From Swiss-Prot:
Its main location: cytoplasm. InterPro entries: AraC_E-bd, DNA_gyrase_inhibitor, DNA_gyrase_inhibitor_GyrI, GyrI-like, Reg_factor_effector_dom_sf. Belongs to the DNA gyrase inhibitor family. One of its GO terms (molecular function) is DNA topoisomerase type II (double strand cut, ATP-hydrolyzing) inhibitor activity. It comes from Dickeya dadantii (strain 3937) (Erwinia chrysanthemi (strain 3937)). Interacts with DNA gyrase. GO terms for cellular component: cytoplasm. It comes from the Bacteria. The gene is sbmC2. Pfam families: GyrI-like. This is DNA gyrase inhibitor 2.
Length: 157
């Protein structure tokens, strides 16, 4: 597990909104999105999941996420019957945790990220947070990066 701080440029993504318990809606959404990309023969370069609600504050059946693909610049998209939309992820300062998630313990990784952010003199910004998947999870483990927009804490240098 390693933490770094990175200034990232804006990034275009093609995403699909899913609603429901994250452990169920995100994998289901990715199945649909990947099937759509294969039908369209789209050469994606990254897979991401954006989380919009805090599970400790929002009912499980109302949790919102976007599953997303990054496509090479200039990729033409054919018929869009799935409702995939193009969005731009804002750039800025991010805390980035590179880790391996075992036994589906994604929440543990997020908690570790927030602890490390505070220990390094930063706080989560009211921006964006997402997971970038660096493998397909077929081994039962997920190599991921968790990106959280951050601001310096007052008094931090």
């Amino acid at each position: 597990m390693t933490l770094r701080f990175d200034v990232a440029p804006p990034k275009k993504v093609h995403c699909l909104r899913v609603i429901g318990p994250y452990y169920q809606s995100v994998p289901d959404g990715f199945q649909k999105l990947m099937a759509w990309s294969q039908e369209q023969q789209l050469p994606w370069t990254e897979t991401l999941a954006f989380y919009w609600d805090d599970p400790s504050e929002t009912e499980q059946d109302q949790l919102r996420a976007d599953v997303a693909l990054v496509l090479p610049e200039g990729t033409a998209i054919g018929e869009n019957t799935l409702g995939v939309r193009e969005e731009t992820v804002p750039g800025g300062l991010f805390a980035v945790l590179h880790t391996i998630v075992s036994n589906g313990e994604f929440a543990k990784a997020w908690n570790e990220l927030y602890d490390l952010i505070a220990q390094n003199g930063y706080k989560p910004a009211r921006g964006i947070c997402f997971e970038s998947y660096l493998c397909d999870g077929s081994s039962g483990n997920w190599e991921i990066e968790i990106w959280q927009s951050v601001d310096p804490n007052d008094g931090a240098q």
